[in-house]
Amino acid sequence: MKYKLLLLDIDGTLRPGSCEQIPKENAAAVRAVQKAGVKIAIATGRGRTGVGKGLLRDLKPDYWVCAGGAQLVDAKGNDLALHRLTAEEMYALVDFFEDYELPLRFTFHDANYAYIDFAEFDRREKAKNLYNNIVDGEDQDHHLVEMPFGCFGFLPREQAAQFQEKYGYLGLQFLYSYPGSDGCDIMQKGVNKGAGLCELAGLAGLTPEECVAIGDGDNDTAMLAAAGMGIAMANGSANAKAAADRTGPDAEPHGVADL
């Protein structure tokens, strides 16, 4: 089968953890695939606002699957699909995270707003070279401008279980990137990168079988499983590798270029 759409995760895949931007070798390899006629989509837990200028060097993706599948965007920056949190979902998260003094942020079009503990987000972002356009939102009022379509928090897994005991009827999912990590995307039921791949494929007139997906984290597993060909990086989680059709090289120093 001739694959027509390549979806690439950023952090831990296109961008090794040691780099502030994707290696030039990876950028060149993706451009070559695009020049050969394959459409390129960036599939990331970041909102579109969190992919800063220069992070992808000179890449010009045809599509974006952002906020873990909640925001689909075209090459010009127009939303193709948007799955916003409801007021009930958002308020439940804020109440719970405030009760336990846990860091929480929401994704909007202009920035990621840290509603709780901006300082902790700022510290972790700098330590991991993420630069995800996070601003101090502790006034907790930006949802009055628009409702968020992405959410990320830091909490132990046992506290995620406690949230589900209290608010399980909401159907929210806590998608941790890696075993042992306390950072997780918090998604609506049915929203993930795999669903985003399928939704984008439909909008582009393609089938999921015509797509290749490359990722490394637990939050990539649905995408790797949904694609016609799923490739997990060697540095990826066990769940990502289990969901993929094959395992590629380590993201360091420029694993995508070595595929």
Residue ranges and their predicted role:
Residues 2-19, 224:
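Asp-based phosphoryl-transfer active-site loop
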Residues 27, 31, 221-225, 241:
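Alpha-helical segments flanking ligand/cofactor-binding loops in enzyme cores
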Residues 41, 65, 212-214, 231, ...:
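Hydrophobic/aromatic beta-strand patches that form the interior of the parallel beta-sheet core
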Residues 100-103, 107-214, 218-222, 226:
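Conserved acidic, metal-coordinating active-site core of Asp-based
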